[in-house]
């Protein structure tokens, strides 16, 4: 086996503290160079069949018409299985090793006093999620972990009752946010030494040129996250491959200046949701995002590992310049606990977090071999 395999085997790490445990390996890297797992719709774990529909629900379910009301009554329970992308709380996800949280925020039609997270249907209060993040970082075991907190969509009013309420919610983590004037290309070791508390990269989707919240980075300026909108594993992998092939046409060197989110997620069609009502029709029929993730996550892990460890894209060897982190940074999944893959020439089976830990050790070894270039991820 390669020396990196010995490093992985001999390095003591825990999912709750893996970044700190790998400090000697990833300290010279920027957050844009580290491989880590992200959770798609991280706060959707609270969606249930009784959850009201939110602002991002399909249009035919919204409105005040009798027809829309009837559809909401009929589809609320069915849609819940497809709206719930995670089954663990945010605290449990962080303890599992997730370091990127994708979230949407809106008002709740049944509780105007608080802001809620949502994915087509209302989930848990935003305050609960932020308290989970706060508790995780207050825990001495995980106090040195970095988190990317991405509020992709805000379904809020422009007045103080909307965005103002959102900003006040964020204030409970104000001493945890990494200032926006700190470049994403900053080595993690510098961030560890500069502050014992600031561990969160706050990203907010906004149509404005400047963020109205001082600690927030504008999503379009600091992150690449492309949704390929495919509902089959084959088409999803093809689309993800094509994103990298397109980026390779414009090679870049140095440290990537933006975070890159690989959206390794299946997009259900209305037909999938309808057929899911009758799961006994065929073994091929799935009735929830959980069922889909159970089937596709293992293949997605194998794809991500093959690309990053072996430099293989659909069986073809590719050379990825140091300045491109396409599919080499944040690996976003539904049901992050599902799926495993073989690493280290098939000698070890691990989950997505363990895979990323090994890839970071592998990357660090390449960086050590050639300190004049950003790390490469090819095993051989």
From Swiss-Prot:
PROSITE patterns: PIPLC_X_DOMAIN. InterPro entries: PI-PLC_domain, PLC-like_Pdiesterase_TIM-brl, PLipase_C_PInositol-sp_X_dom. One of its GO terms (biological process) is lipid metabolic process. It is a peripheral membrane protein. GO terms for cellular component: membrane. It is found in: Membrane. Its EC number is 4.6.1.14. SMART domains: PLCXc. It catalyses: a 6-(alpha-D-glucosaminyl)-1-(1,2-diacyl-sn-glycero-3-phospho)-1D-myo-inositol = 6-(alpha-D-glucosaminyl)-1D-myo-inositol 1,2-cyclic phosphate + a 1,2-diacyl-sn-glycerol. Keywords: Lyase, Membrane. The keyword Transport does not apply. It is an enzyme of class 4 (lyase). Residues 31-205 form the PI-PLC X-box domain. GO terms for molecular function: glycosylphosphatidylinositol diacylglycerol-lyase activity; phosphoric diester hydrolase activity. By hydrolysis of the attached glycolipid, releases soluble variant surface glycoprotein containing phosphoinositol from the cell wall of T.brucei after cell lysis. It also cleaves similar membrane anchors on some mammalian proteins. VSG lipase may play a role in processes such as parasite differentiation or antigenic variation. Monomer. This is Variant-surface-glycoprotein phospholipase C. The lineage of its organism: Eukaryota, Discoba, Euglenozoa, Kinetoplastea, Metakinetoplastina.
């Amino acid at each position: 086996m390669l020396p990196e395999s010995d490093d992985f085997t001999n390095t003591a790490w825990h999912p709750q503290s893996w970044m700190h445990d790998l400090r000697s390996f990833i300290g010279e890297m920027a957050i844009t160079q580290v491989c880590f797992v992200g959770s798609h719709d991280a706060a959707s774990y609270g969606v249930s069949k009784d959850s009201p529909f939110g602002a991002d629900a399909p249009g035919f379910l919204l409105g005040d018409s009798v027809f829309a009301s009837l559809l909401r009554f009929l589809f609320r329970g069915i849609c819940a299985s497809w709206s719930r992308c995670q089954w663990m709380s945010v605290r449990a996800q962080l303890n599992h090793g997730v370091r990127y949280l994708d979230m949407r925020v809106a008002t709740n039609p049944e509780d105007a006093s608080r802001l809620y997270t949502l994915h087509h249907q209302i989930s848990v209060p935003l305050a609960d999620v932020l308290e989970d993040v706060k508790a995780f970082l207050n825990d001495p075991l995980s106090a040195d972990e970095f988190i990317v907190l991405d509020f992709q969509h805000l379904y809020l009013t422009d007045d103080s009752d909307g965005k103002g309420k959102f900003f006040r919610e964020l204030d409970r983590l104000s001493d945890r946010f990494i200032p926006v004037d700190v470049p994403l290309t900053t080595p993690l070791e510098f961030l560890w030494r500069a502050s014992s508390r600031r561990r969160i990269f706050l990203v907010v989707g906004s149509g404005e040129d400047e963020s109205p919240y001082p600690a927030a980075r504008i999503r379009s300026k600091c992150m690449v996250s492309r949704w390929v909108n495919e509902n089959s594993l084959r088409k999803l992998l093809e689309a993800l491959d094509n994103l990298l092939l397109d980026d390779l046409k414009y090679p870049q060197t140095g440290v990537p200046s933006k975070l890159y989110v690989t959206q390794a997620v299946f997009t259900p069609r209305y037909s999938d949701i309808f057929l899911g009502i009758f799961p006994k029709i065929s073994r091929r029929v799935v009735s929830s995002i959980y069922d889909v993730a159970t089937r596709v996550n293992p293949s997605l892990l194998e794809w991500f590992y093959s690309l990053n460890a072996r430099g293989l894209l659909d069986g073809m060897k590719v050379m990825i310049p140091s300045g491109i982190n396409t599919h080499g940074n944040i690996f976003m999944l539904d049901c992050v606990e599902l799926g495993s893959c073989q690493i280290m020439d098939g000698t070890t089976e691990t989950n997505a977090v363990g895979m990323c830990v090994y890839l970071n050790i592998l990357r660090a070894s390449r960086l050590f071999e050639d300190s004049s270039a950003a790390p490469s991820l090819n095993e051989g």
